[in-house]
Amino acid sequence: MASSQPPLPPPPPPLLLLALLLLLKVSDTSSSVSTATSTASETDNLTSKPLTSSFSSSSPTVWEKQTSQEKPETASTSHPDSSSSESTISHSPSNSGTTSTTQPTSSQPEPDTHPSSGSPSSEHTVTSPSLGSVSLATLPWSPTHPKPSTGPPSVSLATTDRTFETSGYAPGDSGVPRLHRNPGVVVAVCLLVSALLIGGAIMAVRRCHNGVSEFQKLDEGLVSRRSSSAHHTLP
């Protein structure tokens, strides 16, 4: 009797083999990417810690230097906001120059309204930044008056004096330049005007006398002619 052998199983198709190989490769790449991201996050944490610590340690010294250089002033401003958050700045006049600031928590710019001194209805609005900046103080000017200069007062006074000297306008004048009068020139002009007036009067008198003399001559001639004609008619 011939020995019966079991039939051999059919070989797996090549498509299944390719699918298995692709799955293995994808799993390897995903594991490598996850390890790379974890190492990158660790390095970021390590580098960010010393930076934040150094910034926090250096910021108080800079703030102290700025406050020590500033002059002691007293000013306070309040800005209304929709979320009822306030921003105040107070400078206490002390030798140490300590200041306390409270910044608003909203991220939108806050309007600062200031009524003008000239008209009660007109308002001057100024938008101040929300975070990381100091809010503006109360503006002392109105739309009808010019904006005050931000430079030192000595420089502004010098510039105004120079402008008055170059343009010839005085601070109280209404726009008419001053004329520097020389007394000698004024006297000469007065003498010329008086001489012209006197000469004109003399010429007018002479012309009047000339006219009268001519009329007299004509009258005398007519009288002599009449007398001569009368003498001729008498004999």
From Swiss-Prot:
Where in the sequence is the signal peptide annotated?
1-31
Q: Tell me which residues are glycosylated.
A: 45
Q: Please list the residue ranges that the record places on the Cytoplasmic side of the membrane.
A: 206-235
**Record's GO cellular component terms:** membrane
Location of the protein in the cell: Membrane
Annotated membrane topology: Single-pass type I membrane protein
Q: Where is the composition biased (Low complexity)?
A: 28-61, 76-110
Found, by tissue, as follows: Highly expressed in large intestine, small intestine, rumen, and kidney tissues.
Primary location? membrane
Skewed-composition ranges (Polar residues): 114-136
Residue intervals on the Extracellular side: 32-184
Q: Which UniProt keywords apply?
A: Glycoprotein, Membrane, Signal, Transmembrane, Transmembrane helix
User: What is the protein name given in its UniProt record?
Assistant: Protein CIST1
Q: From which source organism is this entry?
A: Bos taurus
